[in-house]
Amino acid sequence: MLLPAGRMPAPARSFILALALTGAAAPPAGAQAAQQAPAAQQAPAAQQDSAAPPAAPTPSETRIGLIYRVQPQPSSYDAEAAPEDEGVAGARMGIADNNTTGRFTKQSYALDEAPLTEGGPGAVETARALVAKGTPYIVLALPADEVLAVADALKDTDAVIFNAAAPDDRLRGADCRKNLFHVVPSRAMQTDALAQYLTLMRWRKLFLIVGPNEADRLYAEALKNSARKFGLKISAEKPWTFGPLAKARGDTPTRAEAMVFTRGLDYDMAIVADEAGDWGDYVPYRTVDPRPVGGTQGLVATTWSPVLETWGAAQAQNRFRRLAGRLMRPLDYQVWTSVRIVGNAATVRKTTDPAALAPFLIDPDFNVPAYKGVSLSFRPWDRQLRQPLIVVQPKMLVSVAPEQGFLHQRTPLDTLGIDLPETACKLK
């Protein structure tokens, strides 16, 4: 007997309602399978849509090594002491600049700093270790003998070596090497730059003062060659025998003797040959007759100075100061240029393979901008970097060599240093 809905017992109403809901929620088995099939087909597509896009190609990393000798810090105050990161800071800025341009060419650069310490591995052992671990470009801030030893040790590899510190003319002459590129100017370039300015000023009679070290003798020899080249005259030459007066901590009786040292001489300018900086700064303002002083101190020819601001150099000076917290020095600039040469050549050639870049460095199409007003390039006959040199005193840019009027059939830059007809280089 059917009961009216209103009179149906509560348990019965609950059972009927639950049965109705269960029937509505559970479709037949066929329909359930039909619903699951499209879902299974749609799952891969949904997963593909949510997957991350393919990663961009990873830039290839090129390693550039810097081998340098740690200089002992002075035991007492020395305003001119080389900073501990001299050269290294230039390399770091060069790597940063290479990576800035490398972002657009999928090239990446890293620096391997390899300081040489007392009792540690030598330059040759360090260079071989760098090449063995995949560092094909080596920048050397070392003396000439160590530079030559590294070049010879790596001659059977594809390594490209940059000399950033040794100015010795023999490395561009009898001891030149195919795998060795010179970014630091030779002594001949430095003395030619100074001689051009003296010729321009008609200061033709020179008093040459030579220090006791071998480097001083080599500088004096280069100066004599420049004097012959540009028609100057060494009217007097004397050795310096008064010790390191520029580093003395007070006046001494030697001062009177040094004053007499310059008496009775006929000259327009005194040229000091003191590459160690022991006494050259003592000479200015202490000559008997009022004469300018130049050479390794006083008026000098160099690659870089904090006083250089033209050709975008002020921007480089500011960037370096932010990076290193100090002023940029010539060695910093020379190491920076070495690193940038690699980056610039790789950008043009679209490869960082040293076997491809080494021949390109002496190609007429290669050049590198380096805040000098003109692009720099390598001389193919001795691997020396052509570059203008600035003639400066401590607080002012005086001139830039090559001077106007000194002409050359290829480029005025080849009026500085050893030209092709004069070279003794036979690349090995």
Model regions and ranges:
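Twin-arginine (Tat) signal peptide motif
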Residues: 8, 12-14
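N-terminal signal peptide c-region/cleavage motif recognized by signal peptidases
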Residues: 25-28
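Extracytosolic ligand-binding ectodomains
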Residues: 2-4, 15-19, 31-428
